[in-house]
């Protein structure tokens, strides 16, 4: 228990010695004129708010003796011989800025504990958001090799390609699709069922750069951001027979919208069929060249499934693009056989179904050789 000499060192000579549990008189008395309630709370007295300088007087002794002895005490006051309750005492502690050896150890311990609390809080927030342990994503080349090796049937498309859209990570952003090809679009192409022998088409970005022309309208600047069944029939205005055969609702359900990588280019002859005769002349605005993307004012599906050439000009052999049928696309086979299309296209579709046992050779190449022999 501290004696009178201990109290006299930090205090003024006019002060009265205090009992344990009460703060020094000079510090509490100095603050009691401006904030009597705060000094009364620091002294632990009930009448300290109105008593002024007597906030830590005899009433403080009475209330301090009634408190539980296990209340937390101020560590800085304890280093200098005082036992002060810690509650409400931080602003009025006389040694809060003390730089002695014991008080500096207290300050260092408080800084370390505060840093640990902040670190634990930050780690908890990162684990909730999933930032601290990111899942490593495979590169585009690994996805290509993996998905091409898993393709067992070259003529069948993936079953989810008729209605499901590709994942958002593989779709190009509007800024990225402005006139150049982004390499992360290639896994979306392989997920739609490429063959095993078209690795030269997949790995060449220059081949795909001819398809991603910047659109004139902002609605179509994303590649797959068109309605699923927006089929404005391109052949309706010029050939009525094809329009009538395509106009029914079962045809809309059986024909899926082809993505733009299946539009043919000069090197992609695996997806092309040279028609020896074209019986449906159409105007030039509906005709699809390999270097020109689909017009934005047309439906995005009809102009990509069938392309016609006008007149019997054989200098440029334009291609009739077809989609290899899956189990959901039986309407495409019946459409090509019932509509007045060329016999070569229907024969190519039927032969593609029977060529599933030969993964190395594609059925269209056989049809092309037969047409050249004739």
From Swiss-Prot:
Keyword annotations: Activator, Developmental protein, Differentiation, DNA-binding, Metal-binding, Nucleus, Phosphoprotein, Repressor, Sexual differentiation, Transcription, Transcription regulation, Tumor suppressor, Zinc
Knockout consequences: Severe defects in the adult testis with hypoplastic testes and disorganization of seminiferous tubules and absence of germ cells, due to pre-meiotic germ cell death in testes. Sertoli cell fail to differentiate. Female mutant mice have normal ovaries and are fertile. Depending on the strain background mice also show testis teratomas: deletion in 129/Sv strain causes a high incidence of teratomas, whereas these tumors do not form in C57BL/6J mutant mice.
A Pfam family annotated for this UniProt entry: Dmrt1
Residues within the DNA-binding region(s): 70-116
Biased composition (Polar residues): 354-364
SMART domains hit by this protein: DM
Alphabetical GO biological process terms: cell morphogenesis; developmental process involved in reproduction; germ cell migration; intracellular signal transduction; male germ cell proliferation; male gonad development; male sex determination; male sex differentiation
Role this protein plays: Transcription factor that plays a key role in male sex determination and differentiation by controlling testis development and male germ cell proliferation. Plays a central role in spermatogonia by inhibiting meiosis in undifferentiated spermatogonia and promoting mitosis, leading to spermatogonial development and allowing abundant and continuous production of sperm.
Name recorded for this polypeptide: Doublesex- and mab-3-related transcription factor 1
Organism (species): Mus musculus
Lineage of the organism: Eukaryota, Metazoa, Chordata, Craniata, Vertebrata
This protein's encoding gene: Dmrt1
């Amino acid at each position: 228990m501290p004696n009178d000499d201990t109290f006299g060192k930090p205090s003024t000579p006019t002060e009265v010695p205090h009992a344990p549990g009460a703060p020094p008189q000079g510090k509490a008395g100095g603050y009691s004129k401006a904030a009597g309630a705060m000094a009364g709370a620091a002294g632990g007295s009930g009448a300290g708010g109105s008593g002024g300088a007597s906030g830590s007087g005899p009433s403080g002794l009475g209330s301090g003796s009634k408190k539980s002895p296990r209340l937390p005490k101020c560590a800085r006051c304890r280093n200098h011989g005082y036992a002060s309750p810690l509650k409400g005492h931080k602003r009025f502690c006389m040694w809060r800025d003390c730089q002695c050896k014991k008080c500096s150890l207290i300050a260092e311990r408080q800084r370390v504990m505060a840093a640990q609390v902040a670190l634990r809080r930050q780690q908890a927030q990162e684990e909730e958001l999933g930032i601290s342990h990111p899942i490593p994503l495979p590169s585009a080349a690994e996805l290509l090799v993996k998905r091409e090796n898993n393709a067992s049937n070259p003529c069948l498309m993936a079953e989810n390609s008729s209605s499901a859209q590709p994942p958002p990570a593989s779709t190009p952003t509007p800024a990225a699709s402005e006139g150049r090809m982004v390499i992360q679009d290639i896994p979306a192409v392989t997920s739609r069922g490429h063959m095993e022998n078209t690795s030269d088409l997949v790995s060449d970005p220059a081949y795909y750069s001819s398809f991603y022309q910047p659109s004139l309208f902002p609605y179509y600047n994303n590649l797959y951001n068109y309605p699923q069944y927006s089929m404005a029939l391109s052949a309706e205005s010029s050939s009525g027979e094809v329009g009538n055969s395509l106009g029914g609702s079962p045809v809309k359900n059986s024909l899926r919208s082809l993505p733009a990588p299946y539009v043919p280019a000069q090197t992609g002859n695996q997806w092309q069929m040279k028609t020896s005769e074209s019986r449906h002349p159409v105007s030039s605005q509906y005709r699809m060249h390999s270097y020109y993307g689909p017009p934005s004012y047309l439906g995005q599906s009809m102009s990509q499934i069938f392309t016609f050439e006008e007149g019997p000009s054989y200098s440029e052999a334009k291609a009739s693009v077809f989609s290899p049928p899956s189990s959901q696309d039986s309407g495409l086979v019946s459409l090509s056989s019932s509509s007045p299309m060329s016999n070569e296209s229907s024969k190519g579709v039927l032969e593609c179904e029977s060529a599933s046992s030969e993964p190395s050779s594609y059925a269209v190449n056989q049809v092309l050789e037969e047409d050249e022999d004739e």
